[in-house]
Amino acid sequence: MYVPGIAENLCLDIFHKQKQVISQYFASFHYDCVHQLTEKLLCHQGSLFFSGIGKSGCIARKLVATMQSFGEKAFFLSGDLLHGDLGVVSPGDIVCLFSNSGETREILEWIPHLKNRPVFLVGITAAPCSSLAAFSDFVIVLPKLEELDPFNLMPTTSTTCQLLFSDLLAMTLLRCRKISLSDYGSNHPSGQIGLKANGKVKDYLYPRTEVPFCSPLTTVAESLPTLSSYGYGCVCVVNELFELLGIFTDGDLRRGLSEYGGDILAYPLQQIMTRNPKVISEDSDVLLSLEMMESGNPVTVLPVVDAQQQRFIVGLLHMHALARAGLL
């Protein structure tokens, strides 16, 4: 029978339990085994396989997908290993098997056949005295923590531990490989990740013909129609060669009015503008532009300069354009 309010109480109880077990994971997991395994993978020339049964198999698939996205030669071994799929495994390959208990029947049935290749076998388990651990050449021992369900049977906490380990291994390997954004982007050309990883500033800028310009001698009052009509919240202050001298924003206007009152309207822009503003090259990665906008004193617009001399303004990059493209 439904009792009003019980869902909230149970949810809160499980939430606190999640926080507790996550803390226990970080307190008890010996991560030195991860860097040791990473060293092994960095020197390895053959294929790398991961597998597991049930929910552990889902974690193995996710780890393989993550590694493949940055170019690692990693593959998933299906549960049909003994029905022909064993043929993809070659002598010297590394095979990593997930099993929380270390006693998963299907996994143990695979081991003699894998050993006959032979392969380097890595067991990933929460049971250091299990059969999987005993037969493995290298063992990753994950913390043995209580599951979240009332029976302590459903893979919840255990798969979270496996996932945390998987991400730690994958990201350590990625950093050691010195994978660049362009490397990653070449493997992920589609979707929102592809847009962010492969996009360049020149793909999203407003061209110079649409940029509001003023000379340094233009007064604040004279610049207001330009400032308001373009809707960017700024004007770029340039010389006759379109070299960027500074930027004047609606924020500069508000601060000037607060400090100097109406007298500011007679000031030339060169006296009130922001000199040496944040700028970005047209050939820069669009992700870099997001970092620049959000770092230090956050801004919503970046003047875009030429890639060669980085002095001549070629356009304007506004956060609204990035938002419309789905990059925020």
Swiss-Prot record:
Residue ranges the record marks as coiled coil: none
CDD domains to which the protein is assigned, alphabetical: CBS_pair_SIS_assoc, SIS_Kpsf
GO molecular function: ATP binding; isomerase activity
Residue numbers binding ATP: 52-57
Pfam assignment, any one: CBS
InterPro entries hit by this protein: CBS_dom, CBS_dom_sf, KdsD/KpsF-type, SIS_dom, SIS_dom_sf, SIS_Kpsf
Domain of life where this protein originates: Bacteria
Swiss-Prot/TrEMBL GO biological process terms: carbohydrate derivative metabolic process; carbohydrate metabolic process
Domain CBS, chain residue ranges per copy: 207-264, 273-328
All copies of domain SIS, residue ranges: 37-179
Assigned keywords, A-Z: ATP-binding, CBS domain, Nucleotide-binding, Repeat
Family: Belongs to the SIS family. GutQ/KpsF subfamily.
Protein name from the UniProt record: Uncharacterized protein CT_399
Organism: Chlamydia trachomatis serovar D (strain ATCC VR-885 / DSM 19411 / UW-3/Cx)
